[in-house]
From Swiss-Prot:
Disulfide-linked positions: none
Presence of the UniProt keyword Signal in the record: yes
Naturally occurring in which organism (per UniProt): Marinobacter nauticus (strain ATCC 700491 / DSM 11845 / VT8) (Marinobacter aquaeolei)
Protein name: Flagellar P-ring protein
One GO term of the biological process aspect: bacterial-type flagellum-dependent cell motility
GO molecular function, one term: structural molecule activity
Family, as annotated: Belongs to the FlgI family.
Length: 365
């Protein structure tokens, strides 16, 4: 690609049309090949105030470390390592990270350590999925939680004291080669696959760069012809990713989390005409311990027996009706008027789906 044509592209992109209420391409997609990589390692945290673990693999790791320093422990000696904990160290290696840069790391106990507060992580290699070492970690931990325990076994714990972080605790030793500068095209992968959004992305790019500059492979991938020169490609991409696109509306979905009672209803959810009634059956069980004394002249011991009372109450069933093409606002108003609990709403939505009246995808997580 010539420099003249590249400058014409830059001028066309910077002039552009008037801004609209839309999302930037960088917010809707990710560039193919530009990704993070996960790193993990195994190491020791020392300097704990008696809150270390007593796992056998901690002693083995400690022996191996001593051997590396030329110190051999006699056979049969089992050191009491109350101040040492075996941990896993994890980090995320960003795209284009260079050797010498630093990473934040997370340190997590894998034994029965009570707390990592006040500990120091010894030098730990961090490896990638290919088994190669990409960073070295070491430093003092920052732990947000704490715990305390009494001699009678009672204890209190705030947050999670067995996990800590070390800001800038790892130094990158090896870089990951990126395919960013290879080939004649740059491919964007949409975060949410949608044929309509993919078509609009292609139209927005071609409208700014010219016809046939961008094309869609499927509902996820869109390729754009780009200059080969790395400096031109960076400038080209910095403007390309700021092109605004009006994404398609999401498909109608209702997401239910049965564990937390959370219900999320999408904007395009509608309900066909239906009448619903749902009653509540409440069972209450009360356990009242009572002390039973033996007769004055009888031989026996004082005992405690349970006095159980069971009560069943059924609230009157409420009926409400959905008209044709009922919208999200109408659904929310109907549910609020009858005072339905999240569990009741889940049951109603599942019944509507089975009856074919819920015109949306029902997802239970």
């Amino acid at each position: 690609m010539s420099v003249r044509r590249f400058l014409v592209w830059i001028l066309a992109l910077t002039v552009g049309a008037a801004p609209v209420m839309a999302d930037r391409l960088k917010d809707l997609s990710r560039i193919k090949g530009v990704r993070n990589n996960q790193l993990v390692g195994y190491g020791l945290v020392v300097g704990l105030d008696g809150t270390g673990d007593k796992a056998p693999f901690t002693n083995q790791t400690f022996r191996n470390m001593m051997n590396q320093f030329g110190i051999t422990l006699p056979d049969g000696v089992n050191p009491k390592l109350a101040n040492v904990a075996a941990v896993t160290v994890s980090a995320t290696l960003p795209a284009f990270a260079k050797a010498g840069q630093e990473l934040d790391i997370t340190v997590s106990s894998i034994g029965n350590a009570d707390s990592l507060r006040g500990g120091t992580l010894l030098m730990t290699p961090l490896k990638g999925a290919d088994g190669q070492v990409y960073a070295m970690a070491q430093g003092s931990l920052v732990v947000g939680g704490f715990g305390a325990q009494g001699q009678d076994g009672s204890r209190i714990t705030v947050n999670v004291p067995s996990v800590g972080r070390i800001p800038n605790g790892a130094t990158i030793e090896r870089e990951v080669e990126s395919p960013f500068n290879r080939g004649d095209t740059i491919t964007f992968n949409l975060l949410r696959s949608d044929f309509t959004t993919a078509r609009r992305v292609v139209e927005a790019i071609n409208g700014r760069l010219g016809p046939d500059m961008a094309y869609a492979h499927d509902a996820t991938s869109i390729s754009v012809r780009a200059p080969r020169d790395p400096s031109q490609r960076v400038s080209f991409l910095s403007i390309l990713e700021n092109i605004e696109v009006d994404p398609a509306q999401e498909a109608a979905r209702v997401v239910i989390n049965s564990r937390t009672g959370t219900i999320v209803v999408g904007q395009n959810v509608k309900v066909s005409p239906a009448a619903i009634t749902h009653g509540n059956l409440t069972v209450t069980i009360q356990e009242n311990p009572e002390v039973v004394q033996p007769n004055p002249l009888a031989q026996g011991d004082t005992a405690v027996q349970q006095n159980t009372q069971i009560a069943v109450t059924e609230d009157p069933a409420r009926m409400f009706q959905f008209g044709p093409a009922t919208t999200l606002n109408e659904i929310v108003q109907a549910v609020n008027q009858v005072g339905a609990a999240p569990g009741d709403v889940m049951a109603v939505l599942e019944a509507l789906k089975q009856a074919g009246a819920l015109r949306a995808e029902l997802i239970v997580i």
